[in-house]
Amino acid sequence: MTDMATGNAPELLVELTADIVAAYVSNHVVPVSDLANLISDVHSALSNTSVPQPAAAVVEKQKPAVSVRKSVQDEQITCLECGGNFKSLKRHLMTHHSLSPEEYREKWDLPTDYPMVAPAYAEARSRLAKEMGLGQRRKRGRG
């Protein structure tokens, strides 16, 4: 328990003030007429300090659930935040982690072309769209 908490605060302040002033005076020339002001200033400065707060904990960078290289597999893509496997990450990132794809890439230092969809799933969607004729010019009707 500290001296401040046990009620020895006034004695401690006087002792600290005396130590500080003695150290200062031993290394500096101080006129006798200024000594009272110096003691008063040091004592009031010490009185205005609060109980020391513990230093803020250093925030460590979050480690990914899996390595970036292993996160993209043919059939699935793994979320670096939680380790879940998905065909598409975009909705999961917004609903569970409140991150846009851009924020996710920035947070994990991923390249801008890092996929948000598993490669096999993207290929299947592309193949299906081509079979449906999407992306082709429409033929004019007879008329």
UniProtKB/Swiss-Prot annotation:
Keywords: DNA-binding, Metal-binding, Nodulation, Transcription, Transcription regulation, Zinc, Zinc-finger. GO terms for biological process: regulation of DNA-templated transcription. The keyword Zinc-finger applies. This is Transcriptional regulatory protein RosR. GO terms for molecular function: DNA binding; zinc ion binding. A zinc finger (C2H3-type) spans 79-97. It comes from the Bacteria. The keyword DNA repair does not apply. Belongs to the ros/MucR family.
